[in-house]
Amino acid sequence: MPAPWTICSLLLLSVLCMDLAMAGSSFLSPEHQKLQRKEAKKPSGRLKPRTLEGQFDPEVGSQAEGAEDELEIRFNAPFNIGIKLAGAQSLQHGQTLGKFLQDILWEEAEETLANE
C-alpha cells in the first residue's frame, strides 16, 4: 500500500492540473460567443411617441405644420435618452426641460472640477 503522503501529493497534483486545464477552457463554444457579440450590436427597439389627438388648437396649426418647430435632444451617456417636442410642447415644457438639463450638466461640471 502506498504511503499516505504519496496519495496526498498525487491528489494535490491532480487538483492543480485540473485547475490549470479549466482556467484555459471556455464553457461557451466560439460560435455562441460570436452570436452574442452580434446580438449586442443590434440596436434596441425605439419607443414610438404617442399620438396627440385633440392636443393642438386649430389656431396653433396642425401637427404637420408644427413639425418645423420641433425640438429634439439626445444624450449618449451610459444609456441613450431622447426627447422630442413639437412646437406647442416646447413652449409648454421647454423652460422646465431647460432647468432640468442645466441642473444635470451643472452637477457633472462640479463633480469633474472636484475630481481634478
UniProtKB/Swiss-Prot annotation:
Positions of region (Disordered): 30-62
Compartment(s) of residence: Secreted
Keywords tagged on the record: Amidation, Hormone, Lipoprotein, Secreted, Signal
InterPro entries, per database record: Motilin_assoc, Motilin_ghrelin, Preproghrelin
Biased composition, class Basic and acidic residues, residue ranges: 31-42
Leucine amide sites (modified residues): 97
Prosequence residues removed at maturation: 51-74, 98-116
Lipidation (O-hexanoyl serine): 26
Major site of localization recorded for this protein: secreted
Keyword Signal: yes
Keyword Coiled coil: no
SS bond list: none
Lipid-conjugated positions (O-octanoyl serine): 26
Chain residues carrying a lipid of type O-decanoyl serine: 26
UniProt-recorded Gene Ontology molecular function terms: ghrelin receptor binding; growth hormone-releasing hormone activity; hormone activity; protein tyrosine kinase activator activity
PTM comment, free text: O-octanoylated by GOAT/MBOAT4. O-octanoylation is essential for ghrelin activity.
GO biological process, any: response to estrogen
Gene Ontology CC terms: axon; extracellular region; extracellular space
Cleavable signal peptide: 1-23
Family of this protein: Belongs to the motilin family.
PANTHER family reported for this sequence: APPETITE-REGULATING HORMONE, GHRELIN PRECURSOR
Name the UniProt record assigns to this protein: Appetite-regulating hormone
Protein's organism: Bos taurus (Bovine)
Biological classification of the source: Eukaryota, Metazoa, Chordata, Craniata, Vertebrata
